């Protein structure tokens, strides 16, 4: 496996959403895909070194290059999630710098994640759920609290389980439900309803969810 390359840039290419360079490493040319942000800073005849993720399939070998081991490791975390292939991973790396991406995943910022090409809401939710702890840990951050943590018992509706069950029956998944309850508890639409007003909590959550999906 190739883990690191140092060489002279002999060719730069952009094809669609892919940004690629060809590195001359001791007489061997390696085609390496990088983010467009990095591609724009490079020139032909420039010597660079990159940490490499090597993707091997039955009919194709691909190299993805990164300036640091941290960037490469974040990329590897991303593509470990079902439905996130190398191109989607690169789109996420292009949309956000490393720290921004870690924070978006750790904080469940689905809107930011969905700005990356090819990342829909369901995929963003999987990223937030599956990587929240691991991506924060290896990037040197404390994991953010889960999306429902930090809501006091006084803020939660007394029939919170019923609210969650009703929203689940309406087709909302666990992450969406927890985000909605936390948003209402934190007063995103004004003071939270009384704890015993199940209908008001349900209406508030539904209104928040409808805006969030817009």
UniProtKB/Swiss-Prot annotation:
Keywords: Cytoplasm, DNA damage, DNA recombination, DNA repair, DNA-binding. Transmembrane segments: none annotated. Residues 155-214 are annotated as: Domain III. One of its GO terms (molecular function) is four-way junction DNA binding. Residues 147-154 are annotated as: Flexible linker. Residues 68-146 are annotated as: Domain II. It is found in: Cytoplasm. Residues 1-67 are annotated as: Domain I. GO terms for cellular component: cytoplasm; Holliday junction helicase complex; Holliday junction resolvase complex. InterPro entries: DNA_helicase_Holl-junc_RuvA_I, NA-bd_OB-fold, RuvA, RuvA_2-like, RuvA_C. One of its GO terms (biological process) is DNA repair. Its main location: cytoplasm. It holds the Pfam family RuvA_N. It comes from the Bacteria. Has three domains with a flexible linker between the domains II and III and assumes an 'L' shape. Domain III is highly mobile and contacts RuvB. Belongs to the RuvA family. HAMAP family: DNA_HJ_migration_RuvA. Homotetramer. Forms an RuvA(8)-RuvB(12)-Holliday junction (HJ) complex. HJ DNA is sandwiched between 2 RuvA tetramers; dsDNA enters through RuvA and exits via RuvB. An RuvB hexamer assembles on each DNA strand where it exits the tetramer. Each RuvB hexamer is contacted by two RuvA subunits (via domain III) on 2 adjacent RuvB subunits; this complex drives branch migration. In the full resolvosome a probable DNA-RuvA(4)-RuvB(12)-RuvC(2) complex forms which resolves the HJ. The RuvA-RuvB-RuvC complex processes Holliday junction (HJ) DNA during genetic recombination and DNA repair, while the RuvA-RuvB complex plays an important role in the rescue of blocked DNA replication forks via replication fork reversal (RFR). RuvA specifically binds to HJ cruciform DNA, conferring on it an open structure. The RuvB hexamer acts as an ATP-dependent pump, pulling dsDNA into and through the RuvAB complex. HJ branch migration allows RuvC to scan DNA until it finds its consensus sequence, where it cleaves and resolves the cruciform DNA. This is Holliday junction branch migration complex subunit RuvA. The lineage of its organism: Bacteria, Bacillati, Cyanobacteriota, Cyanophyceae, Synechococcales.
């Amino acid at each position: 496996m190739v883990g690191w390359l140092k060489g002279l840039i002999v060719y730069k290419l952009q094809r669609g959403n892919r940004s690629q360079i060809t590195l001359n490493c001791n007489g061997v040319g390696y085609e390496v895909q990088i983010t467009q942000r990095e591609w724009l800073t490079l020139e032909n005849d420039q010597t660079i070194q990159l940490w490499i993720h090597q993707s091997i399939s039955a009919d194709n070998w691909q190299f993805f290059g990164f300036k640091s081991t941290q960037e490469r490791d974040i990329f590897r975390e991303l593509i470990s999630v079902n439905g996130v292939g190398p191109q989607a991973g690169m789109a996420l790396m292009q949309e956000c710098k490393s720290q921004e991406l870690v924070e978006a995943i750790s904080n469940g910022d689905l809107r930011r994640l969905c700005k990356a090409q090819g990342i829909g809401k369901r995929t963003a939710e999987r990223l937030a759920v599956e990587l929240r702890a691991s991506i924060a840990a290896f990037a040197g951050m404390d994991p953010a609290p889960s999306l429902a943590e930090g809501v006091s018992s006084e803020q939660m509706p007394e029939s919170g389980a019923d609210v969650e069950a009703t929203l689940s029956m309406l087709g909302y998944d666990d992450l969406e439900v927890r985000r909605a309850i936390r948003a209402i508890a934190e007063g995103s639409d004004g003071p939270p309803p009384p704890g015993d007003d199940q209908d008001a909590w349900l209406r508030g959550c539904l209104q928040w969810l409808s805006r969030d999906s817009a």
